[in-house]
Regions:
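N-terminal pre-P-loop "Q-motif" helix
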Residues: 77-78
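Membrane-proximal basic amphipathic "stem/tether" segments
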Residues: 1-70
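S-adenosylmethionine/decaboxylated-SAM
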Residues: 48, 57-72, 83, 91-254
Length: 254
């Protein structure tokens, strides 16, 4: 009992240290400091070590492979959240979707565990749409219109070509949503960075989530994304659960 208790205390300390490290690292990285990049690499190594406490080596290896194959700006724990939540939701009815695919890193993690479900992927494949005054990091502007344009529909299709039931759509969401307007979803992943894009996704997908369906977002620490979730969830009284790193989940409960 003492051994288990001691191990749990050790893990709790590691988790709290990691949360603080993530927050400070992001502030430094967004400031484009050399020290920030150093801290980012250090944090990545720390998180892989933390994940190895309870997870199969093949999961850790998969995340490492994805980070080598494509530009994938997720910390390891954030990548694991995408993988593990998608895996859990694959046992429920409903399809899966992602808006904000970029080069396909998180889509590959979802594809690995979707259990034959359809995965619908949406992106402009031309970078971010118009950035507004709400789209700040810690109160200062950072994103630029057209950022993350280093991708293409063809590259993502080729990257995910070994997986079945993958459907890709090019254009600004929800303008491209017509093919899925009558579908239901068990899992939706958002990585759209901006306030208006987040609102558009929530308004489209939340009514189409099954009972128990989960929407997971990246960049919840940014002002625009967090404000979008707060505004959308307030009147509907939807609980928001912030995860380690920059993620948040909401669940459809009827």
């Amino acid at each position: 009992m003492c051994k288990i208790f001691g191990h749990n205390i050790k893990l709790t300390i590691l988790l709290k240290a990691n949360r603080s490290m993530v927050d400070n690292t992001r502030k430094l990285v967004y400031g484009s400091s050399i020290f920030g990049k150093f801290m980012s690499n250090l944090n990545t190594k720390f998180q892989f070590r933390l994940l190895s406490f309870y997870n199969d080596k093949k999961i850790i290896d998969l995340i490492k492979i994805v980070k080598k194959e494509v530009d994938f700006a997720f910390f390891p724990i954030e990548a694991y959240h995408v993988y593990s939540i998608a895996k859990s939701q694959s046992k429920l009815d409903g399809d899966m979707a992602e808006v904000g695919v970029y080069q396909g890193g998180s889509a590959k993690l979802i594809a690995e565990v979707k259990n034959g479900k359809e995965l619908h992927l949406f992106d402009t494949f031309e970078g971010l749409p118009k950035v507004s005054e709400r789209d700040t990091h810690f109160g200062t502007s950072y994103w630029k219109t057209g950022e993350f344009s280093n991708t293409s529909l063809e590259k993502v299709k080729n990257y995910l070509s070994n997986y079945k039931n993958i459907f890709c759509y090019k254009g600004k969401f929800p303008d491209t949503s017509e093919p899925i307007k009558n579908k239901k979803f068990s899992f939706v992943h958002l990585d759209v960075d901006l306030f208006q894009s987040t609102i558009d996704c929530l308004e489209f997908f939340y009514p189409r989530m099954i009972n128990g369906g989960v929407i997971l977002t990246h960049d919840y620490h940014t002002d625009g994304v967090k404000q979008a979730f707060n505004e959308f969830c307030k009147d509907k009284k939807i609980p928001q659960i912030q995860l380690l790193g920059s993620q948040c989940i909401i669940t459809k409960l009827e």
